């Protein structure tokens, strides 16, 4: 989860988020190299009084600065497309959870079970227990098994919402009348916090998301207790 004065991303807890972090570093390095080269050329032009007349109209230079950016864009696009396909791929999910956005709470339905659904509201600040996080705790956490592929179906009952959990690399729009899907898989147990990431009204800031990833045995006991 995030902490005060954090400068980087949250710690990755899923293969998708790890890939996104690597892609971020890859792209940032390319941007840094390009910026350094441009700054060097500008500095060189400002500090020298010499002018090479043949470079003012040289087809070779124009060819280079056309082909080189195209190659750089390809180096950025290829890993980006790979990650996009990974995020959209859904192969034999072990569990399907339907998520509905409301003003201003989330509701969840475990579609593989006959009657397992609940609403998830933010706990008011006045009701928080010691150690709980302000504006992030909910009365009903989404309990899921770790190290298993889970399909999330996301939609909305009223206005646009967005279901996002940064440490898992998840952000899916909840659109009324449309069912979007995404997959998640956590490589470790723990609590993972998120929030609605689409302005949806006056209480938009009070729609937290809490996922509790646990071993399969613990999840089975929890699901039995909820039925």
Curated annotation (Swiss-Prot):
Residues binding Mg(2+), per UniProt: 198
Entry GO CC: mitochondrial inner membrane; respiratory chain complex IV
Membrane topology, Mitochondrial matrix segments: 46-59
Residues in coiled coil: none
CDD domains (alphabetical): CcO_II_C
InterPro entries in the record: CcO_II, CcO_II-like_C, CcO_II_C, Copper_CuA, Cupredoxin, Cyt_c_oxidase_su2, Cyt_c_oxidase_su2_TM_dom, Cyt_c_oxidase_su2_TM_sf
Mitochondrial intermembrane side: 1-14, 88-227
Topology class, membrane: Multi-pass membrane protein
A single GO BP: ATP synthesis coupled electron transport
Entry GO MF terms: copper ion binding; cytochrome-c oxidase activity
Job of this protein: Component of the cytochrome c oxidase, the last enzyme in the mitochondrial electron transport chain which drives oxidative phosphorylation. The respiratory chain contains 3 multisubunit complexes succinate dehydrogenase (complex II, CII), ubiquinol-cytochrome c oxidoreductase (cytochrome b-c1 complex, complex III, CIII) and cytochrome c oxidase (complex IV, CIV), that cooperate to transfer electrons derived from NADH and succinate to molecular oxygen, creating an electrochemical gradient over the inner membrane that drives transmembrane transport and the ATP synthase.
Quaternary context: Component of the cytochrome c oxidase (complex IV, CIV), a multisubunit enzyme composed of 14 subunits. The complex is composed of a catalytic core of 3 subunits MT-CO1, MT-CO2 and MT-CO3, encoded in the mitochondrial DNA, and 11 supernumerary subunits COX4I, COX5A, COX5B, COX6A, COX6B, COX6C, COX7A, COX7B, COX7C, COX8 and NDUFA4, which are encoded in the nuclear genome.
Entry's family note: Belongs to the cytochrome c oxidase subunit 2 family.
Descriptive protein name: Cytochrome c oxidase subunit 2
């Amino acid at each position: 989860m995030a902490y005060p004065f954090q400068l980087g991303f949250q710690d990755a807890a899923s293969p998708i988020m790890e890939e996104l972090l690597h892609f971020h570093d890859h792209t940032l390095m390319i941007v840094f190299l390009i910026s350094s080269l441009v700054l060097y050329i500008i500095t060189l032009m400002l500090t020298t009084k010499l002018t090479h007349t043949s470079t003012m109209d040289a087809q070779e230079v124009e060819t280079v600065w056309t082909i080189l950016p195209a190659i750089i864009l390809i180096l950025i696009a290829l890993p980006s497309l790979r990650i996009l396909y990974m995020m959209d791929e859904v192969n034999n999910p072990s569990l399907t959870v339907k998520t509905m956005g409301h003003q201003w709470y989330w509701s969840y339905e475990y579609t593989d079970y006959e009657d397992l659904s609940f609403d998830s509201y933010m706990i008011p600040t006045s009701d928080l227990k010691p150690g709980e996080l302000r504006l992030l705790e909910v009365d009903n956490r989404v309990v899921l098994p770790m190290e298993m592929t889970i399909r999330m179906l996301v939609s909305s009952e009223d206005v646009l919402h967005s279901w996002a959990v940064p440490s898992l690399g998840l952000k899916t729009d909840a659109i009324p009348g449309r069912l979007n899907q995404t997959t998640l898989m956590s490589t470790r147990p723990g609590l993972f916090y998120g929030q609605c990431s689409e302005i949806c009204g006056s209480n938009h800031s009070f729609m937290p998301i809490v996922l509790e990833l646990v071993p399969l045995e613990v999840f089975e006991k929890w699901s039995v207790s909820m039925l």
